[in-house]
Amino acid sequence: CELSNITIVLEKEECGACVSVNATWCSGYCYTKDANLMYPQKSEKQGVCTYTEVIYETVKIPGCAENVNPFYTYPVAVDCHCGRCDSETTDCTVRALGPTYCSLSQD
């Protein structure tokens, strides 16, 4: 479980454009075990590779009207660990659209 470079696409519908940015995020493997065979009544907590700390960076999205805030702030991981996925701040599913999805025109 470690920091890795990733390209993500930021989208602001009011501006009609998407922008690709480089960032760091956490990826990799965490130790897991399945005790169901030996102890079916005991459930194990499985760790996932997630961030310990993030900072926020801001980019200006082009093509925004004058009455629209053109700035978009996004998280960038600065440290990773194996732990519980916090569904309050993270999409813990595997059904996300992916970091390069854009429903608008891309710059």
Curated annotation (Swiss-Prot):
MF terms (GO), sorted A to Z: follicle-stimulating hormone activity
Pfam families in the record: Cys_knot
Disulfide-linked positions: 1-49, 15-64, 18-102, 26-80, 30-82, 85-92
GO biological process per UniProt: estradiol secretion; follicle-stimulating hormone signaling pathway; G protein-coupled receptor signaling pathway; regulation of signaling receptor activity
SMART domains: GHB
Swiss-Prot/TrEMBL keywords: Disulfide bond, Glycoprotein, Hormone, Secreted
Glycosylation sites: 5, 22
Subcellular location field: Secreted
Gene Ontology CC annotations of this record: cytoplasm; extracellular space; follicle-stimulating hormone complex
Annotated InterPro entries: Cystine-knot_cytokine, Glyco_hormone_CN, Gonadotropin_bsu, Gonadotropin_bsu_CS
Segments forming a coiled coil: none
Record family assignment: Belongs to the glycoprotein hormones subunit beta family.
Quaternary structure and interacting proteins, as annotated: Heterodimer. The active follitropin is a heterodimer composed of an alpha chain/CGA shared with other hormones and a unique beta chain/FSHB shown here.
Purpose: Together with the alpha chain CGA constitutes follitropin, the follicle-stimulating hormone, and provides its biological specificity to the hormone heterodimer. Binds FSHR, a G protein-coupled receptor, on target cells to activate downstream signaling pathways. Follitropin is involved in follicle development and spermatogenesis in reproductive organs.
Protein name as it appears in the record: Follitropin subunit beta
Species annotation: Aquarana catesbeiana
Highest classification ranks of the organism: Eukaryota, Metazoa, Chordata, Craniata, Vertebrata
